[in-house]
């Protein structure tokens, strides 16, 4: 199959691309390298340096490549930035996703797999390990955007028959992760430990 991976130069996306190529799939990457790294791009994949916000270029790529499945990882990743500039966050994370969904609809893509959020979707739900049945109550524009896209995907499935899988990742860590990023506490701690640096905890105690 031919699979398009948005955000395929990023930490998670590039690892998915490598696995798909190992499984003998044809892979197309769309990434504007805002947070991705060209060094992560598998040379056996076809690479387009394009933003998901560029509707015309996205449409052209889908028409040209005849995609079977889309794995959508491209996003504005910073929760704090989403609070500081919610309009920009919505432009990338909601409108960008809609550009992908429209291209899927118009070119008869079989399925979309969406990278949602396992932390920000639930807000302060009080559960140690919320599952899919837990109440979604996002408290940041980033979380609101991710949940909104989940609903858009379900709507496109109901309206146009687009199959989907939604993955709510939480505290993902692994190869190629930026240990200096604002997210990814496991990678940050591992990075500090391997560099023999102190790990600082900020603790709030309510009595």
Spans of features found by a protein language model:
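NAD(P)-dependent short-chain dehydrogenase/reductase
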Residues: 126-128, 154-207
């Amino acid at each position: 199959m031919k699979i398009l991976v948005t955000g395929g130069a990023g930490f998670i996306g590039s690892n998915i691309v490598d696995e798909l190529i190992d499984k003998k799939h044809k892979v197309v990457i769309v990434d504007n390298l805002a947070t991705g790294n060209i060094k992560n791009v598998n040379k056996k994949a076809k690479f387009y340096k394009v933003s998901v916000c560029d509707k015309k270029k996205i449409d052209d790529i889908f028409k040209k490549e005849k995609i079977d499945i889309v794995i959508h990882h491209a996003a504005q990743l910073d929760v704090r930035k989403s609070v500081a500039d919610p309009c920009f966050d919505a432009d990338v994370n909601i409108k960008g996703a809609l550009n992908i969904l429209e291209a899927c609809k118009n070119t008869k893509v079989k399925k979309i797999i969406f990278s949602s959020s396992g932390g920000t979707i639930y807000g302060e739900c009080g559960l140690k390990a919320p599952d899919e049945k837990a109440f979604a109550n996002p408290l940041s524009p980033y979380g609101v955007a991710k949940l909104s896209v989940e609903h858009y995907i379900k709507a496109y499935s109901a309206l146009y028959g687009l199959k989907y899988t939604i993955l709510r990742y939480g505290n993902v860590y692994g190869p190629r992760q930026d240990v200096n990023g604002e997210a990814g506490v496991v990678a940050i701690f591992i990075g500090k430990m391997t560099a023999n640096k102190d790990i600082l905890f900020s603790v709030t105690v309510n009595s």
